[in-house]
Design a protein with these regions (language model features):
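Substrate-binding pocket helix/loop in short-chain dehydrogenase/reductase
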Residues: 115-119, 123-131, 226
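Active-site loop-to-helix junction immediately N-terminal to the catalytic Tyr of the SDR YXXXK motif
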Residues: 117-118, 168-176, 188
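C-terminal substrate-recognition "lid" of short-chain dehydrogenase/reductases
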Residues: 139, 150, 154, 234-263, ...
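Residue(s) in the substrate-gating loop at a strand-loop-helix junction
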Residues: 162
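Alpha-helical segment proximal to the catalytic Tyr-Lys
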Residues: 147, 191-195, 254
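Active-site helix of classical SDR
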Residues: 142, 178, 186
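Short C-terminal tail/terminal secondary-structure segment
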Residues: 2-8, 111, 115-116, 167, ...
């Protein structure tokens, strides 16, 4: 990969915590922050995929020509975000070791076939799994990093939403409800924490051609539906989303909070 398309000096040396950073949008975001000179911390359950992401990032260090001496290897912490106790224990360990988390990216969510359940198919167990994996940890990770951000004079939190609740997508009613709730959290907490210079924004991806989506969801029929719905006639890729996340975390976006940025190729056609 070439050097990042935009360099944000304000991010150099910052600690960035990314959930679900082993693959897909998360992995692309790990790469983008690492190339900005950040210490990236990955929370995920996919240890092997996380290691591949870390190795890939480090293979780029000599190819960018941008701050080669400050590209730090991302670090991985095994954490099942659906397990609140595990989230809290792991976060406490990270905060003890790294101090302040300057940027939090709440990306992890239940996706693929596990999230594609109709209303009649959703059991109480499936409901809890969706809520715990796609929503609950967003609140409690934010809660955990707030004290350090306040002490540091501010910080940035980027929550990953989705256009599924805006379309709306009847195939994922619980997932859509979780992502609508993420929007509500973003708006409420941005008001609550703005006085402390903590900015909270969300990014709402559309149909992003991650490897998991290609393997599980992006059939020729579904891709044809995506192309009919999008204005842009190309597959959107994880890097399209990652670039927006990094911008929102930087000081270039210092006046932006409580906002949602849609990356959907024109599917919704409004903010």
């Amino acid at each position: 990969m070439p050097a990042p398309s935009a360099i944000y000096p304000s991010l150099n040396g910052k600690n960035v915590l990314i959930t679900g950073g082993a693959e897909g949008i998360g992995a692309a975001t790990v790469e983008r922050f690492a190339l900005q000179g950040c210490q990236v911390i990955i929370l995920d359950i996919a240890r092997d995929l996380a290691q591949k992401t870390i190795e890939h990032v480090m293979s780029l260090a000599d190819k960018t020509g941008i701050w080669p001496s400050t590209i730090m290897a991302p670090v991985f912490y095994y954490c099942d975000v659906s397990n609140l106790s595990e989230v809290q224990t792991t976060t406490s360990e990270i905060l003890r070791k790294y101090g302040t988390v300057h940027v939090l990216v709440n990306n992890a969510a239940l996706t693929g076939h596990k999230a594609r359940l109709s209303t009649e198919e959703v059991t109480s167990e499936a409901w809890d799994m969706n809520i715990n994996t796609s929503l609950r940890h967003v609140f409690f990770l934010t809660q955990a990093v707030i004290p350090g951000m306040k002490h540091a004079g501010g910080g940035s939190i980027v929550n990953l939403g989705s256009i599924t609740w805006r379309i709306p997508d009847p195939a994922v009613p619980v997932y859509g409800a979780c992502k609508a709730a993420v929007m509500g959290l973003t708006r409420a907490q941005s008001k609550e924490l703005g006085p402390f210079n903590i900015r909270i924004n969300s990014v709402m991806p559309g149909a992003i051609a991650t490897q998991r989506q290609r393997d599980e969801v992006l059939t020729p029929e579904y891709r044809a539906e995506v192309m009919r719905s999008q204005s842009l006639q190309r597959d959107l890729v994880p890097e399209d989303v990652a670039k927006v996340i990094v911008f929102l975390a930087s000081d270039e976006a210092s006046g932006i909070t409580g906002s949602s940025y849609v990356v959907d190729g024109g599917w919704c056609s409004d903010p």
